[in-house]
Amino acid sequence: MASLTFGYSTLADRLENIQVPSLDSHPDWDVLITVQSGTAEMPSAEQLAKAPKGDRIQVLAFPGKGVTKLRNQVLANAKGDYLIFADDDVTFDSVGLQDAIEEMQSAELTLALGQAVNETGKLRKKYPVKPVRLNKLNSAKAATYEMIVNTKKVQASGVLFDESFGAGASETYLGDEYIFISDLVTKGLNCYFIPVTFATHPTQSSGSGWGTEQDRKARAKIFDRVFRGNRTLPYLVRVGFGAKKLGKGLTLKNFLLFIFKR
């Protein structure tokens, strides 16, 4: 059976929130926890003592902040044939993960994007009802804990998370998952959405809000990065994405500002 690494990334003061999956009945599963202090200093021994413990749980500590830096450490150090990225407030569906890995093996996928439910068991957003090949237009709503990758294929591709984006970045604190998938797609790698539930995650998240100036500018810059090298497409794509949010937290004025990154 293929092995799987659960790759967590968090800040030191949130370590105790992590609920690792049961490894007892899965000898080929392991847990890798990457943790940052949020400051120039390393996490303290007292903070690290709150991390989950076990024979197949590894903790790697770093100074500073920036979740994409930690995701890249997860990519570099994962031992499993497959890797699922994890936040400190997510719990996983073991059966769904096993089904996903079998499908990834059968279809020779580099990345599978799956579903997640909220605390009540309701799907967190609208998902396709059948497998769909991912591209730069249909993967913008991806969440970290919805992604499983073939570890060796991604490592061989050289694709990493863009460390200018994601939680901890001063301005562009969103979009790192979307950019990661887009870079894999650009490389011609096999990336699909599959209608399988991977995890449970709280309803509110860093990607839930629209409308503030900071949020609007952060989202606008994501499309420049995804479609870099093309001067027109980022504007057209912002029109399409922004239009869907009109009246749903995005005013007409802010819609126009979003298009032009104002």
Task: Annotate each language-model stretch with its function.
Residues M1-D30:
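N-proximal low-complexity "stem/linker" segments adjacent to membrane-targeting elements
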Residues S208-P234, N254-R262:
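Catalytic core of nucleotide-sugar-dependent glycosyltransferases
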Residues A61-A78:
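Glycine-rich, basic loop-to-helix element that forms the pyrophosphate-binding segment
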Residues V95-Y127:
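Conserved donor NDP-sugar-binding/catalytic core segment of glycosyltransferases
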Residues Q19-A61:
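Acidic donor-binding segment of Leloir-type glycosyltransferases
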Residues A167-E171, N190-W210, R219-I222:
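Active-site donor/metal-binding and catalytic loop motifs
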